[in-house]
Amino acid sequence: MNPEFLPASGASRTVSIGDVVTEAGVTIFDAELRYFAFYDSPDGAADYAEFSAGPEPGLSPEERPIVLIEHALTGDGNAADWWADMVGPNKPIDTTRYLVLCANVLGGCQGSTGPSSPHPDGQAWGSRFPGLSIRDMVTAERQLLERVGVTKIHALIGASMGGARVLEWSLMHPEMINAALPIAVSARASAWQIGLQSSQIRFIEADPAWHGGDYYDTGEVPSHGLGQARRIAHLTYRGELEVDERFGVDPQNGENPYGPYRDPHQRFAVESYLDRQAEKLVARFDAGSYVVLTDALNRHDVGRSRGGMNAALGSCEVPTMVVGVDTDILYPLHQQEHLSRNLGDFIGMSKITSPTGHDGFLIESRQMGQALAKFLAKAEIIAEGTEGAEGTARA
């Protein structure tokens, strides 16, 4: 990586990546992506034998193998925050050994160009922001890496929507990737997923404050619609048994949902929980970005224009390990098992056992850490083999 583009560890930088042309032929002028970098000095680092796989510490950050992390739908580039148990010195993704990068996705609202960003005419893009595919996001990230001087990704890791980007990266730019790890994702959106996700979009679009997507200069925010979308989405991120065990049919403290008439202020405990999740998202995320990114998930299909899903997976040349969660109702485990049966260079699968559902990759730190350790150990072996083969060829 060009050291001129390397921010301080834990900090971010926003760079212009030029125009991005979508699959559908729409140009996003002078797009920007914001990215975070994580790296630490090995001085004084304790031995962490359980997760010891990786290059020897001591290389300067820009010389280290690069781990590129792809965040999920409403995530951001600050991977050491939302994946704090996984990213850091002497953690599974060891920042004393690797240079870890994570970019905010195109279409988002965390510093990269999206619907809330200024159009060249000075107004917000709003409804003029084009529909995106997962491939468009990868195109933007590829332009970012080219801009900052990255030519090789040692390990590509992503979950949920990030996992979809991992799969597309592997098919679009296999020459750049040493090894890949998609987590809790599928090869394409299922009809069930599209139904769930499009229903969330409809709630936002039905909010009077949406104004057809052009609400940015109105002083209004479609917070009700975004909150309703989050309530639906959050249930799909958790496990059914876990939610029932936590809340059951208990009323919220001080409220009585068993009264003679329906009263929205008299809630079950689970309703209060979902209301709180909605409030938190509304406070930090843009409804326009939520629509664009959720629509991109609906469009996800690795088989489109590649001869079908299985043919596309079979053509994948990147050594790929897969992780799934046994209680995931958003991306059920059978979808990761399908990946494992059809990927062209499949190198293993790990199953996270958890009552917490899709969010298990965030919650089950011990199991996720073990899976990452296995993957990064495999990535090292692959890299050593590649270097050996290249040396033999040169000889």
From Swiss-Prot:
Matches recorded under InterPro entries: AB_hydrolase_1 (IPR000073), AB_hydrolase_fold (IPR029058), HAT_MetX-like (IPR008220)
Residue span, AB hydrolase-1 domain: 65-363
EC number assigned by the record: 2.3.1.31
The keyword Translocase appears for this protein: no
BP GO terms, sorted: homoserine metabolic process; methionine biosynthetic process
Residue positions of the active site: 160, 328, 358
Keyword Cytoplasm listed: yes
Enzyme class, UniProt record, top EC level: transferase
Catalytic activity reported: L-homoserine + acetyl-CoA = O-acetyl-L-homoserine + CoA
Gene Ontology, cellular component aspect: cytoplasm
Family: Belongs to the AB hydrolase superfamily. MetX family.
Identification of the protein by name: Homoserine O-acetyltransferase
Lineage: Bacteria, Bacillati, Actinomycetota, Actinomycetes, Mycobacteriales
Gene that this sequence comes from: metXA
